[in-house]
Design a protein with these regions (language model features):
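C-terminal helical "tail/cap" subdomain of flavin- and related membrane-associated enzymes
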Residues: 289-372
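Beta1/beta-strand and adjacent pyrophosphate-binding region of the FAD-binding site
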Residues: 2-18
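FAD/FMN-dependent oxidoreductases across multiple families
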Residues: 213-289, 297
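Predominantly flavin-linked oxidoreductase catalytic cores and closely associated redox partners
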Residues: 110-234
Length: 372
């Protein structure tokens, strides 16, 4: 039997990664927190299932522990385009490939440890001036946090829909039973699409195709990459294909009155960055501090700051998607000068400054392209 409280300090709409991270961070600040989601756990979501070192550090600040048998460590990135390939290790530790459901279970465990109230199978019907409405009545609260994803109803109810920019791509994911052949997250670049490959277990890989074509599926995309197709064609599937929209969205505001947004509900970057989870973890920590300090403007400022590096890296990486000419020259240049790619990877995970990135990556890369 689900017991719904009549009152709580903060009510979080959405029990995915952002909602649970928010609950954990807010409980650490002493707030009473209730989370509601219409789904039953563990909640799955289509993504590349790779956590970079900085995302793992954010999880650590939330006190979340991943079980060793549930993740596979990877050392960096590898880009592949035709015959050209380049890889680089993270300068600040290893990443972790992990099934989204295992991550969700770890977040649930931590949220329960902190004393958050979790309501599963409970949809939120709307907002009131003093709380939220459920099927069973109204829950009074001081703050409502919308953590209900890309198509956030809370964002719509609060009048926060106005976006400064928006673009869409489409992703389709499948898991394969196969021993990882790589210790990197691999991105295969093709004409109009990319395929991301993440080792997530000793006998399992996560494979995602991303494109602007909502009809392009893995079965059509994989033959475009003969080497990868050859590795996977005889591997058994461990999941059915699952799709999702990857949006690049910047909102004009992330709070209004007593309603705040976090995670994809508050804006998002393209999945090519692999930064969505880190962003929601860091946003949750910033949100908790701002509410503890009773300073919503500080949350808005922190939110903008957190989004800058991922937005820049997404724009940089997606420029390769727009132009085959540029993509081939960049990949050839990176292959011949791996130190340039190493600086890009360092920037990607927050281990290099903008000045370092321009001096050690962008300027040398530009010279290579012009000389090609």
């Amino acid at each position: 039997m689900i017991i719904i409280p009549k009152q709580t300090d903060i009510f979080i709409v959405g029990g995915g990664s952002a909602g649970l991270a928010g609950a954990i961070a807010l409980r650490a600040r002493g707030f009473g927190v209730t989370v509601a989601d219409p789904a039953l756990p563990p909640i799955d979501k289509t993504c590349g299932e790779g956590l970079m070192p900085d995302a793992l550090a954010s999880l650590g600040r939330l006190g979340v522990t991943l079980r060793p048998e549930h993740f596979f460590p990877f050392r960096g990135f590898r880009f592949v385009s035709g015959r050209a390939s380049v890889d680089a290790s993270f300068p600040n530790g290893t990443g972790a490939g992990i099934r989204r459901t295992h991550l969700h279970e770890a977040l649930i465990d931590r949220a329960q440890e902190t004393g958050a109230t979790l309501l599963w199978g409970v949809p939120v019907k709307g907002l009131t001036k003093t709380g939220v409405t459920l099927d069973g009545g109204t829950v009074e609260c001081r703050w409502v946090v919308g953590a209900d994803g890309e198509n956030s109803r809370v964002r719509r109810w609060a009048g926060l829909e106005s976006a400064r920019s928006k673009s869409l791509r489409f992703g389709f994911r499948r898991h394969y039973r196969i021993t990882p052949w790589t210790d990197c997250v691999e991105i295969y670049w093709g004409s109009g699409c990319q395929i991301y490959v993440t080792p997530i277990g000793h006998e399992e890989m996560c494979v995602v195709v991303m494109s602007r074509d909502s009809h392009l599926r893995l079965d059509q995309a994989l033959p475009m990459f003969p080497e990868l197709f050859g590795r996977l064609k005889n591997a058994a599937w461990t999941s059915t294909e699952r799709g999702a929209v990857s949006a690049t969205r910047r909102l004009a505001r992330v709070y209004s009155g007593h309603v705040l947004l976090v995670g994809d509900a508050s804006g998002s970057v393209d999945a090519i960055t692999g930064e969505g989870l880190r962003l929601c973890f860091e946003q949750s920590l910033a949100l908790a501090k701002a509410l503890s300090d009773d300073n919503l403007k500080a949350y808005a400022a922190a939110h903008r700051q957190l989004a800058r590096r991922p937005a820049f890296m997404a724009a940089l990486m997606l420029s390769l998607d727009h132009s085959a000419w540029l993509r081939q020259r960049v990949l050839r240049a990176l292959s011949s000068e791996p130190r340039i790619f190493a600086t890009q990877v360092a920037m990607h995970v927050g281990a290099a400054t903008t000045t370092d990135f321009i001096r050690r990556s962008m300027l040398p890369l530009g010279r290579h392209i012009l000389a090609a």
